[in-house]
Amino acid sequence: VWTGVAKVMRDRGVDDLAFVQHEAAQGELFAFGISEAGNDLVLFGSDTDAAPDPDGGYRFTGTKIFTSLAPVWTRMGLHGLDTTSPDGPWMVYAFIDRPEAGAGDAASIVTRDDWNTVGMRGTQSRTTELHAAYAPANRVARRVAPGPNPDPIVFGIFSVFEILLAAVYDGIGARALELAVATVQKRRSKQSGTTYSQDPDIRWRIADAALAHDAIAPQIQSLARDVDGLVDHGARWFSLLSGVKVRSTETARKVVDDAIRVSGGSSYFASNELSRLYRDVLAGIFHPSDDESAHATMAAALLGPVATPTDKPA
C-alpha cells in the first residue's frame, strides 16, 4: 500500500514519501499501521496518541490491529492524533523502524501472537502495541487536520487501499468461478448420466455468478486509470472509491457462495481450495470502507451532510 501511496503523492507534486519507494526497492518491508479497534473514523481520527518531541519527531502510543506480515515487517507507516501542539490538533502520519532484538527501544513495539482467524491466515495480520514508538523528524510525512480532508496523503491512502482491496477480492471471485467451472465439467449426475455442466440449473447459477463477476474488473480498472491520470472527481472521489470496494467484496462473496453450491459436498472439507476461498472472502466485510460507511459517504456526496437540529430547511 505505502509504495502506491508514494506514487499517488509524487504524481501530484508531493514527494514526501520518496524514501518509501527507495527503501522498498532495497528490500525494506512496509507495514500498514492504520486500523484501530472501534475507530470508525479510520483516516479522519485516531485513538493512538502522537506526542511531539522538541526535535520535530513523534512518539506513538496506542494499539494497531490487522498489521499484515506482522512477524517480518521492517518499517511501519502509521497515524496518530497530536492533541498537545499549540497549533493542533493534528493527524500525524509517520514511519517507524522495527527495533532490533535486544535494543534499548525493543519494548516500544510489541507484536502479539494473536492471529487465530477463520480465514486470511497466511497474512499474519497480528495486533501491534505501540509504547512511545519513535518516528524521527525526517520520518514524519504529514500533519493534517482531523476529519475529512483532501490532503494528498489521505487521498493516496484511501485510493490505493480501496482499489487494491477491490482487486484482491475480485481475484478471489475469479478463482472461485474457475474452480466451479472445472468441477461441474467433471462431476456426473447419477440420474442423467451426464456431467453437471449440462444441468440447466447449474448452468444458470454459474452464468449468474459470471455475470456479476464480469461487472467488477472494468470498474476497478477505470478508477485506477483515473487515479493515475489525475482525473478530478472532486467530492465524488471518496464515494466512488468506497463504492467499488464494497461492490467487489460483496460480489466476490456471492460468486464464492455460488461456486460452492454447484461444486458439491467436497467443497465443505477444509482441504478443498473453495473452502479456503470461502473463509478468506469473508474478511472483505471487515476492511474499510464497510457497507454502512460506503452508503453514508455516497449519501453525503449526493445529498450533502445530514442536517443538525439547528439547521434551517433550504
Where are these regions (language model features)?
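Glycine-rich beta->alpha junctions and the first turn(s) of the following alpha-helix
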Residues: T117-H213
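Short, structured patches in soluble enzyme cores that scaffold and shape functional sites
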Residues: I34-E36, P52, K64, H79-D82, ...
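C-terminal helix-coil-helix/basic helical segment that borders enzyme active sites and/or dimer interfaces
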Residues: D214-V246, D257-Y268
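A short core secondary-structure module
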Residues: T63-T111
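Glycine-rich phosphate/pyrophosphate-binding beta-alpha loops
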Residues: I65-A70, F161-L165, G284-H287
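Glycine-rich flavin
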Residues: V1-V72
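Generic structural signal for well-ordered, non-transmembrane alpha-helical segments
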Residues: G171, A207-D214, S242, V246-R253, ...
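Glycine-rich phosphate/cofactor-binding loops in nucleotide/flavin-utilizing enzymes
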Residues: G265-A314
